[in-house]
Amino acid sequence: MYNHNKIEKKWQKYWLDNKTFKFVDNPNNPKKFYVLDMFPYPSGKGLHVGHPKGYTATDVISRFKRLNGYDVLHPIGWDAFGLPAEQYALETNNHPHTFTQQNIKIFRKQLQMIGFDFDYDKEVDTTDPQFYQWTQWIFVQLYKHNLAEIQDIDVNWCENLGTVLSNEEVVLNDKNERVSERGGHPVVRKPMKQWVLKIVDYADKLLDGLNEVEFSESLKSLQRNWIGKSIGTSVQFKIKDSLLTLDVFTTRIDTIYGVQYLVVAPEHPILKSITSEQQINVVQSYIEQTKKISDLDRIADTNKTGVFSGAYAINPINQEIIPIWVSDYVLMNFATGAVMGVPAHDERDYAFAKKYALPIKSVIDTKQKLPYAGDGLHINSAMINGLNIKQSQNVLNDYLIKNHLGKKVANYKLRNWIFSRQRYWGEPFPVLFDENNQIKIIEDLPVLLPNLNEFKPSKTGESPLANAQEWLYVEIDGKKYRRETNTMPQWAGSSWYFLAYILKNEDGSYTPLNSEEAKKRFAKWLPVDVYIGGQEHAVLHLLYSRFWHRFLYDIGVVPTKEPFYKVINQGMILGENNEKMSKSKGNVINPDDIIASHGADTLRIYEMFMGPLTASLPWNPDGLDAMRKWLDRVYRLYHNLSELEVVEDLNKLNEEIIIAYHTLIKNYTKAINEQAFNIAISEMMVFVNVLYKNKVINYELLDNFLILLSCYAPHLAEELYSLNHSESVCLQKMPIYDEQKIIAQNITIPIQINGKLKHTINVLRDTNAEELVNLALACEQVKQEIGDQPIKKQIVVVNKIINFVI
């Protein structure tokens, strides 16, 4: 057993001292590869064994591409702003900056212990003013292009966290209560002024962009469903005995003749004007009741509730008078906050009508049981009788548009991005307010985050930055301004950090994002070729970063519409019992312990050998032991060469070794290109078995095997390569396979008589048919089987078979 601790520390020091993995950007090399990990939040807990899975995958790709002559960008950085850091600071009575930097050092050391080929001169930190200067600059551009504004909106307020949360940061707990994703604290709806980024304006571009990238279908579906585009019609219904109108959205305008009631969201502002005196108390009580229910619960397939508003509307198509109901299954933040009730042709409407004894009118000819939502010819529908859905919708849309009663519209489930947080540890907004609350944008960036010792969030929603009196007020040209005291969310820095790696210079500075030099670099390095991270970021981070990147494309900063060409979500590493690792279950495994007992190379190769990268699989100590034994076997092979026969010319090795060698290189290459990392390891194992079996080696072959091994077990590969070489194995060239040498030259041909196998012969590949027949007939066993019987027919397939019919 080799001393992994000694070997791994030796080579980690060598790589750092010699800057082995220093980023290379050769202007004469058109081959580039940008492989990226979703950068970590540097928590005090450090890495667990799940982290190295994705990092090792990108490391294998990075090393492999470098061997193949690519300029490779494989960077690392820290997503260090945000709620988790601030919460931990409050709990431990520390300043977030102090322990964040301490945690980064711990994380960096752990990454170095695993042997990743990061160039740490390219490292980025979202809390670095040189970094967040450009986060602020992007916000300024969004504001200038009318994509950032302050709105009075109902927000998700978490009193325990003292901040507003985006819709995506709110989840349901076991009791179906709305809580914060981080910490599980109660969340309520509360009206507040907030900065909002208008991501909905980019909904169609984000949908279209999915056609240009290589994401899994499940990942694309998650994004499409989150955006939730629906095409329909907005129809104006007049309110009876009023000058008011109500805009109602429907995707089935063809069923408008079957409308028996309208339903509005409890938050709809029209209720204040149309609710009858008799129903005011009932409606108000229902509104208060709804505030306690989550949006997810409201739209869930459960028993629907509602109350009558006391008001009526007039159907613009047939002038029928229909009641207006209030129900929590209609959300104000989707479409118009009002829908048609067509119980004959919608399951939800049908259940609602049955519950409240509302009439049901069928307008599609069907023999099926109601409710029927399929296609068919329309009945009881005047101008569209006898038409199918598509025909009916065309006729009705034309009529409504012509008569100014409606229009075709697209609606989205996607909500605009609430972009401000009432917390301290985040990027300050480059925004000032004058005495009249008029906005002045700060162009001189960065706006630095002041050093506060007291940063506990208030219960009122006032940001801790309001306490920074010296920082808070600014005088410009004799006019006094107050700074924006909210900060940006953690998602801000992660929405563009992949560009920062390209801009980061060796001296620690950043090339300006809006410079010509930046454009030159982006032209070569974008998009990211492969981006690997957990599926938990499949919607939020991925959607936000795609939005920012597409915006930067639109204003001419970047040359690509999409930031990432291929995204892979790695599966989790579960506990031995197939449960998710957690402290409470006591099944968390620290990679430091594995490195100490088995070595970093063993950890790397085991996590890549567990199965497909995208699969979630249980940790298996036996599998870990098996990988260590295999690495020991490789080590022994190179230290026991005196027991093996050495052949100077690789091409003069026996056929089995030559075939195995070229097959290894071919299959290894294919496996890594397809991210089938476990298959590449299997191929290396098969090859080592062949070497042990034959007891014959060649030094070129042994060197080339170590080049392949270096992608997975770089420390051991370096150590063994250094036995005969002074340069790093990681900087060598990928060996090339010869397709012709994968094909065996000596092959076995079966000989059949009347279709039954009687004998085989060994011949050279491509031996012609005549020669094959002669060789077959020369075999004693074949001669005995045929005897004196005449051969009626001989069937010969070169390289395959010989069959004599007698």
UniProtKB/Swiss-Prot annotation:
Cellular component terms per the entry's GO annotation: cytosol
Reaction catalysed by this enzyme: tRNA(Leu) + L-leucine + ATP = L-leucyl-tRNA(Leu) + AMP + diphosphate
Keywords: Aminoacyl-tRNA synthetase, ATP-binding, Cytoplasm, Ligase, Nucleotide-binding, Protein biosynthesis
Binding-site residues for ATP, renumbered to this chain: 583
GO BP terms in the entry: leucyl-tRNA aminoacylation
Motif 'HIGH' region, residue range(s) on this chain: 40-51
Motif annotated as 'KMSKS' region, chain positions: 580-584
GO molecular function: aminoacyl-tRNA deacylase activity; ATP binding; leucine-tRNA ligase activity
Ribonucleoprotein as UniProt keyword: no
EC number: 6.1.1.4
PROSITE patterns cross-referenced by the UniProt entry: AA_TRNA_LIGASE_I
Localization terms from the record: Cytoplasm
Superkingdom as given in the UniProt entry: Bacteria
Alphabetized NCBIfam families for the sequence: leuS_bact
Annotated HAMAP family: Leu_tRNA_synth_B
Similarity field: Belongs to the class-I aminoacyl-tRNA synthetase family.
Protein name, entry field: Leucine--tRNA ligase
Naturally occurring in which organism (per UniProt): Ureaplasma parvum serovar 3 (strain ATCC 700970)
